Amino acid sequence: MQSPRRNAEGRPLGTCDPSSSGSPAHGGGSRFEFQSLLSSRMPGADPTSARLRASESPVHRRGSFPLAGAGSSQALPPQLPEEDRIDLNPSFLGIALRSLLAIDLWLSKKLGVCAGESSSWGSMRPLMKLLEISGHGIPWLLGTLYCLSRSDSWAGREVLMNLLFALLLDLLLVSLIKGLVRRRRPAHNQMDMFFTISVDKYSFPSGHTTRAALVSRFILNHLVLAIPLRVLVVLWAFILGLSRVMLGRHNVTDVAFGFFLGYMQYSIVDYCWLSPRTAPVLFVLWNQP
C-alpha cells in the first residue's frame, strides 16, 4: 500500500494546518491560497486594467451599440450622418419614366419588322428604304435650290426662299438636339443609310420625321392642292415616320418627338417669314426673271 504524498512540512497533500482553518489567505500552503495568489496577479484584477478594458468596450464607443441578445463584444457598425444616406425610395416620376422607356424599347423592337432581310417583313425593306430617301435632306435641299433658280415670279421665289430657310433650320435644330441628347440608335438597326454625317449615329429626334412634318405643313399652307393631293401629303408624312421604326432606325419616342418638333418648326418659319420687305438683300440675288 502506497503512502500518501506529503508536502515539505511532512503533512499529507490536500490537508491544511489546523492553525489556518479560517480564511484561505492565512493558509500556509493550501491549494486555495495558491489559487488566490494566482488570481490576484492576473491582469484583470488590476483596477487600472479593468478601467482600460471598460473604456474600450463597444458600449463606450461613439456611434456603436451592442446587439440585442448578443454579448458585449458584438456591436453595430457606426451610423452614417443624415446627409450621407442614400434615399433608396425612388420617386413616382422616376418610376414612370423608366416604365415609359421600357415600353418604348419593347414596342420599337416589335415594330421593327423591316430591320433586316431576315425579319418578318424583310421583303418590304427596299420599299422602306426608297421611302427613306424621299425624306432625306439632300434631295429636298437640291430640289429647292433648283426650283428657286428656275422660278420666274416673285411669289414663287418668296415661297421657295422660305422653304429653303425651313430646311436649313430643320438641319440645324436636329443636329443640335442629337448632339446634346446622344441617344444611340436601336440595337437591331443596320447602318446602311443614304449619306450620313457624324450626328446621324444618334437617333433622337428622327430627322426624317421632323422634315416630313415641316414640309407637309408648309405645303398644305402655301400650295393650292386638290383634296386627294392634300391627303397624299399627310399620308406621306405619317408613313415616312412609321417607316423609321419599321426599318429599325429609330424608337417610337424619336418619331413622336420628331412630329412635334417639325410641327413647331413651321411655326417659327411662319413667324420669321422672309419677304422682299423683310429681307430685300436675299431677293435681289434672284431678281432676274
UniProtKB/Swiss-Prot annotation:
Pfam families with a match to the protein in the record: PAP2
Superkingdom field: Eukaryota
InterPro entries the record matches: P_Acid_Pase_2/haloperoxi_sf (IPR036938), P_Acid_Pase_2/haloperoxidase (IPR000326)
Cell compartment(s), UniProt: Endoplasmic reticulum membrane; Nucleus envelope; Nucleus inner membrane
Stated family: Belongs to the PA-phosphatase related phosphoesterase family.
Annotated protein name in UniProt: Polyisoprenoid diphosphate/phosphate phosphohydrolase PLPP6
Membrane spanning residue stretches: 127-147, 159-179, 223-243, 255-275
Entry annotated with the keyword Nucleus: yes
Post-translational modification: Phosphorylation by PKC activates the phosphatase activity towards presqualene diphosphate.
Keywords: Endoplasmic reticulum, Hydrolase, Immunity, Innate immunity, Lipid metabolism, Membrane, Nucleus, Phosphoprotein, Transmembrane, Transmembrane helix
Region (Phosphatase sequence motif III): 243-254
Biological process (GO), any one: geranyl diphosphate metabolic process
Annotated source species: Bos taurus (Bovine)
CC per GO annotation: endoplasmic reticulum membrane; membrane; nuclear inner membrane; nuclear membrane
